[in-house]
Amino acid sequence: GLYSMREEQIANYERAYAYVTQLDKNGISYLAYPNETPVFDYKNIKPVNKRIVAFLIKGDNIHIKGIEVIGVQVTIKGHTQSECFEVLGSNNTLENLKMHDGMAIGVYMLSGSHNLILNCDAYNNWDSVSEGAKGGNTDGFGAHLKKGSVNNIFRGCRAWFNSDDGYDLINNAEAVVLENCWAFYNGYSSDFVSRGDGNGFKIGGYAKGRKPYDDVVANYTPIPKNTVRFCLAVGNKQGGFYANHHLEGNYWHNNTAYKNRVNYDMLNCLALNPIDFGTDGPGWNHELVNNLGFAAKVRELENIDKSRCILKNNYFDLNTTVTSSDFVSLDETLLTAPRQADGSLPNTHFLKLTASSKLINAGTDIGFPFKEKAPDLGCFEFDGKH
C-alpha cells in the first residue's frame, strides 16, 4: 500500500535534522509482508530549514526489507542534503529497498560496523531546491564513516539517474567494500539534462585540500584502501570508476566500464604531507586487476602512474582491442530490468561475453570462483553460453 507521511509523524528534531522514523531498538526486523510492497511517500513533509531523514537507524541488528521510500524533500536553499536512510548502528541489513523520485540520498552511512546494504535501488533522485538546483549533493549511496566503523559492504545495489554520484566514499575513515553493484546515468536527470558531478563510483578523497591537514591526519589516517569488485559503470556523466583525489590507492578488481566520459580515472593527490595533500597527481598505489572497459566517450584510462600501481590483466594493457563483437548485447535498457525473485540483480545478456571473445580466460586468479582455466575480464564470468 501507499502511505502518505505527515509532518506530525516526525519522531525527533535534532540540530539541523528532522528524523521522521527513528529505529533505536536492537534486534528488530521490519519486513514487507510477502507479495506486498509498502511505499512511504514523504512529499508532504517539508519542515522549514531542516534536513529531512526518512529513517534513522541508530540501533544494532536491525533488518529492513522490501519497502520503498519516495518523495523525500529538501527545504534549505543553501548547502544541505536529505536522506532516505541514515545508518549509525552496527550489524544491520538493509535489503531490497527502493529509494526513488525524491530529492534525497538513498543510503547514507556515517558510523557502525558490519552493516550490509543488499540488493537496493536508488534512482531518479534530484535536489531541485538547494544551491541553484544543481543537485550536487544527491548521491545514490554514500559511506562517510568514522574511525572504527569497519566491515561495511554494499552488495548487489543499483544507482541510476541520481543527480550527483552513484556511490560516494568521500571523507571516509575506514575501508568499504562495493561488490556486484551497478551505476549508470548518474549526473543526469531522467531525460539526460546535466546535473551534478556524475561519477558512477567515487571512491575516496578528502575534499582536495579544503579540509585542514591536521583534520585529515587526526580523523582519517591511516587512509583506507577501499575495494570495488565485480561492479558495472555505464553512461555516467564523468568517471565510471573514479579515485576522487584520494590519498591512497584502492583495489579495483574485475569491473566493467562502458560509455562513461572516462571509464577509469585514478586521480589522486600527491602525498599525505602538509604541502602535497591538496595537490592533484596521477594515481599511485592502486591495484587494478582483470578490469574491462569499452567505448569511453573521451578516454578509457587517465590520471595514473602505472609505475607506482599494481596492474594485472587489464584490458588497457592487452595486445588485443575490445570491440562490440565481444559482447552478446549492448542493449542498455536491460540495466533497469526487474530484479530476480530473490531480489538479486537481473540476469540479462547486457555486456556478457560471447563464446568467441578473447576476453574469456584473459584474467588472473584473485581468489574468486571462475569457470574455465582462468577468470574472464570484467564483472560477468562467461557461463558456457554467454
Task: Locate each region found by the language model.
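N-terminal, post-signal-peptide segments of secreted/periplasmic proteins
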Residues: 3-24, 346-353
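C-terminal accessory segments
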Residues: 319-386
